[in-house]
UniProtKB/Swiss-Prot annotation:
One of its GO terms (biological process) is mitochondrial electron transport, NADH to ubiquinone. GO terms for molecular function: NADH dehydrogenase (ubiquinone) activity. Keywords: Electron transport, Membrane, Mitochondrion, Mitochondrion inner membrane, NAD, Respiratory chain, Translocase, Transmembrane, Transmembrane helix, Transport, Ubiquinone. Core subunit of the mitochondrial membrane respiratory chain NADH dehydrogenase (Complex I) that is believed to belong to the minimal assembly required for catalysis. Complex I functions in the transfer of electrons from NADH to the respiratory chain. The immediate electron acceptor for the enzyme is believed to be ubiquinone. The chain crosses the membrane at residues 2-22, 26-46, 60-80, 93-113, 114-134, 151-171, 179-199, 203-223, 242-262, 274-294, 297-319, 324-344. This is NADH-ubiquinone oxidoreductase chain 2.
Length: 347
């Protein structure tokens, strides 16, 4: 295990890498920020000294190295042709497509998604939460910047494929971390489908996704539910189980929970672009994800053993105000949608 000082240093380094990518105006600085992120999370992933953790760390390093190498080569070619390192799409469609694929690989989108479930299953919930949320911010920032000049179909087709792969892949899983990995793949499909049309809404949906996913990971960490069968055996933390029910339904995008904001905004944006058939296919794919969310809810609540006495229930639990706040935001933010849109579209 890592000492608290080293762990805090690594977490601050993670934040530094993302901020470097956010504030960079050149490809070389953006690439350095991505590399700082990768180097900082590797010790966090391997801290348990378990063979599965080491295997997951190795797979993650190989996948990220391939994406970073491709991104650096395409950035060098762009600088060679344009004469500067400024973050701008390349005029060569082959270079632009390779750059987009490299960022999709780092995001874990289909068809470059194979590393994500295998890596996620070897991590603990907190490190998995960082991988599924914070590590997505820097690549999606770069993807949004080049998506405006990219061929729309080159982004929309992987986005649609991610929704179907995320839903289909999670159907036969029993590991909760693998289910959340496929959930992340499906959500990345919805988020990136808006990147060519509306960067502001793309950022809003990304932050909402990070909020709900973080709350779900923390809740499963509290319940120690590594497998979905463990959800039926938890007798003493029924409040967390009830909160998990709401969080899973919010991840599925059911109204009036917070997760419905992402589906609603994406549907409105795609409909405005006259992509009705594409939107219908995205909705059909999201039903697959909703099925395994509902199955987890069924196991968590319906199949839980009855408690005939209140002595088994920990009513006097330690106050956890941050967890309470993040859970409330993850489930009750839908009524604030007009205000969120007003804030994010403010120029």
């Amino acid at each position: 295990m890592l000492s608290p000082l080293i762990q805090s240093t690594l977490l601050m380094t993670l934040g530094l890498g993302t901020l470097v990518t956010f504030s960079s105006t050149s490809w070389i600085l953006a690439w350095i920020g991505l590399e700082i992120n990768t180097i900082a999370i590797i010790p966090l992933m391997a801290k348990t000294h378990h063979p599965r953790s080491i295997e997951a760390t190795t797979k993650y390093f190989i996948a990220q190295s391939a994406g970073s190498a491709t991104l650096l080569i395409t950035a060098c070619l762009t600088a060679w042709y344009s004469g500067n390192w400024a973050i701008s799409p390349s005029n060569d469609p082959i270079i632009l497509n390779a750059m987009t694929l490299a960022l999709m690989l780092k995001l874990g989108m289909a068809p470059m998604h194979f590393w994500l479930p295998e890596v996620m299953v070897g991590l603990d919930f907190i490190t998995g939460m960082i991988l599924a949320t914070w590590q997505k911010l820097a690549p999606i920032t770069l993807l949004i910047q080049i998506a405006q000049d990219q061929n729309n179909m080159f982004i929309l087709i992987p986005a649609l494929l991610s929704v179907f792969v995320g839903g289909w892949g999670g159907l036969n899983q029993t590991q909760t971390r693998k289910i959340l990995a496929y959930s992340s793949i499906a959500h990345m499909g919805w988020i990136t489908s808006m990147a060519p049309f509306n960067p502001t809404i793309t950022w809003l949906t990304t932050l909402i996704y990070c909020l709900i996913t973080s709350a779900t990971f923390i809740n499963l960490h509290i319940l120690k539910a590594n497998k979905i069968t463990a959800l039926t055996m938890n007798k003493h933390n029924q409040i967390s189980q009830m909160l998990l029910l709401l969080l899973l339904l919010s991840l599925g995008g059911l109204p009036p929970l917070t997760g419905f904001i992402n589906k609603l905004l994406a549907s409105i944006e795609l409909a405005n672009q006259n992509l009705i058939i594409y939107l219908f296919m995205m909705m059909m794919g999201s039903l697959l994800s909703l099925f395994f969310y509902t199955r987890m809810c069924y196991l968590s609540i319906i199949l839980s053993p009855p408690c005939s006495t209140t002595n088994l229930i920990l009513w006097r639990v330690v106050s956890n105000k941050p967890m309470t706040l993040i859970t409330m935001l993850s489930t009750n933010l839908f009524i604030m949608t007009p205000q969120l849109l007003a804030v994010f579209t403010l120029h």
